[in-house]
């Protein structure tokens, strides 16, 4: 083709045809109807809307239908096999007269087979005009229209209902057809229906979504939304842009689960809109594990200030086993009675013996396993036991003590013994008398400590007293003065000096400097007037 002044001959021919077709009607329309928009700069740019399709120039014909077909080809740019615009083509050459952008419609005899849908690019005064009928097979949503025909995003501002909102830069309103009144979602499948693969379609989607979320539309900067606030959309862009069906990656990965989250106070939060994890509990982070498995990571939650706080500070949700496991691992508060009978976590100031509240708790725990302890805990009426409470003798010969676990042993019970077994009567007068004066101190101490409660203990104590040994009532030891050493201080009530005391544990005499008070020493033991020297038959 021959280019003249930057334009091809085909472009000039198209310009003459369209000018002759629409020039008269434009003049008549403009003169007969008052336009709502007097500024011609408010209409769409023809060079950006109608990309040139040079390979269709050879198919041009002088007939009207051929010219319209050529015009349709110029209007919608280079066509693919499905009659759709291809990406990457030049759209800088002006293709149409301005008369098209001012409301002139195409002749009614043009059929959809020509690839030219009837459209109006600005809002005429009549509400019936300016409607963009679309074939359901070729219908695009508002975002795809703006990207497909090259209209800038600023002039292609669309509302959430799919209708263009008229503003200073975009007076046109592009309506949806009547047969589909519901809004179509902005999905990749709708883009793929125009002969593009999913990667190409998402290239357009990414450019549009990046402008929306970054708050930039090419003309001014506006505070936008963060892609992390919409995890499903952000993750889908990532997966579709790569072209591989990668598994779903949660954008909240690495963040703490929503349970127990603590947000900033209302006065510290920023004025911008933000979404937190606790606002969407159904979208936990990747650190969330199966509730059936306990994990140490669920023991701590991250606050917005970056400090770790215990999960007990936040709300608890039913079925949250991680919080239950955490509570069990924490130190239990209050009195704890262990299965082995030990009591832990006793508060300070509480009575710790068996007469306080601790003893009552242990007794109740023991009564749960031993029913016999219930009678001792609650008490029993002695009159219901069949005992003679008025008897001066022992009420029950075999009852040793309330705390005894078994009855009395046979040797502890006063049974009737036949006289044949009582030999002391026959031999007591034949036994030699015991002469404790002949025994040494070591044997006397042995008789004293090994015959407790017996007359031999009393006799040994008397003999030790005669040998200048004294029993200290507070120290509970036997003491005597060291031989050849006089007290360093002596008064009527006490004396101080070196003394020997008998260590029964090590069985030896130990010298020690001691302050001795006389009133703390035991007096001479009192012996009965008559007693039998046989310790096996005569008890003290």
Curated annotation (Swiss-Prot):
This is CCR4-NOT transcription complex subunit 2. Belongs to the CNOT2/3/5 family. The modification Phosphothreonine is found at residue 93. Pfam families: NOT2_3_5_C. Residues 96-126, 276-342 are annotated as: Disordered. Component of the CCR4-NOT complex; distinct complexes seem to exist that differ in the participation of probably mutually exclusive catalytic subunits. In the complex interacts directly with CNOT3. Interacts with NCOR1, NCOR2. HDAC3 and GPS2. One of its GO terms (biological process) is positive regulation of cytoplasmic mRNA processing body assembly. It is found in: Cytoplasm; Nucleus. It comes from Mus musculus (Mouse).
């Amino acid at each position: 083709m021959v280019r003249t002044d930057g334009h091809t001959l085909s472009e000039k021919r198209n310009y003459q045809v369209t000018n002759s077709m629409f020039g008269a009607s434009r003049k008549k329309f403009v003169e007969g109807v008052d336009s709502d928009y007097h500024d011609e700069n408010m209409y769409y740019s023809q060079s950006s809307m109608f990309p040139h399709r040079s390979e269709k120039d050879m198919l041009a014909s002088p007939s009207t239908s051929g010219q319209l077909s050529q015009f349709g080809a110029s209007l919608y740019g280079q066509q693919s096999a499905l009659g759709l615009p291809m990406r990457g083509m030049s759209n800088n050459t002006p293709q149409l007269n301005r008369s098209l952008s001012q409301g002139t419609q195409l002749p009614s005899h043009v059929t959809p087979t020509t690839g030219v849908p009837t459209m109006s690019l600005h809002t005429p005064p009549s509400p019936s005009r300016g409607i963009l009928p679309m074939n359901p097979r070729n219908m695009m949503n508002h975002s795809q229209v703006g990207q497909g025909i090259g209209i800038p995003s600023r002039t292609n501002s669309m509302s959430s209902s799919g209708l263009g909102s008229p503003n200073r830069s975009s007076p046109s309103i592009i309506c949806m057809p009547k047969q589909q009144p519901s809004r179509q979602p902005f999905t990749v499948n709708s883009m793929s229906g125009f002969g593009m693969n999913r990667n190409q379609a998402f290239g357009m989607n990414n450019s549009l979504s990046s402008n929306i979320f970054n708050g930039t539309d090419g003309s001014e900067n506006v505070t936008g939304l963060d892609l992390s606030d919409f995890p499903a959309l952000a993750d889908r862009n990532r997966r579709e842009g790569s072209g591989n069906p990668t598994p779903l990656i949660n954008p909240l990965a690495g963040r703490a689960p929503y349970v127990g989250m603590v947000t900033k106070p209302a006065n510290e939060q920023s004025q911008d809109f933000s979404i937190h994890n606790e606002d969407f509990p159904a979208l936990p982070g990747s650190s969330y594990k199966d509730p059936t498995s306990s994990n140490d990571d669920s023991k701590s939650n991250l606050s917005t200030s970056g400090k770790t706080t215990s999960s007990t500070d936040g709300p608890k949700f039913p079925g949250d086993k991680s919080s239950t496991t955490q509570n069990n691992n924490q130190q239990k508060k209050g009195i704890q009675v262990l299965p082995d009978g030990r009591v832990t976590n006793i508060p300070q100031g509480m009575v710790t013996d068996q007469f306080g509240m601790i003893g009552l708790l242990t007794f109740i725990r023991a009564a749960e396993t031993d029913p016999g302890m219930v009678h001792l805990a609650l008490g029993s009426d002695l009159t219901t036991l069949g005992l003679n409470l008025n008897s001066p003798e022992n009420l029950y010969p075999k009852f040793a003590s309330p705390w005894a676990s078994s009855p009395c042993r046979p040797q502890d019970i006063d049974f009737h013994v036949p006289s044949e077994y009582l030999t002391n009567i026959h031999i007591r007068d034949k036994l030699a008398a015991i002469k404790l004066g002949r025994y040494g101190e070591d044997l006397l101490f042995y008789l004293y400590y090994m015959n407790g409660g017996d007359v031999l203990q009393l006799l040994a104590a008397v003999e030790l007293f005669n040998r200048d040994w004294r029993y200290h009532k507070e120290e509970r030891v036997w003491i005597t003065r060291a031989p050849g050493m006089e007290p360093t201080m002596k008064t009527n009530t006490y004396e101080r000096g070196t003394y020997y005391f008998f260590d029964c544990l090590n069985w030896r005499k130990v010298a020690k400097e001691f302050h001795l008070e006389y009133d703390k020493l035991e007096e001479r033991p009192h012996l009965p007037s008559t007693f039998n020297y046989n310790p096996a038959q005569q008890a003290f």
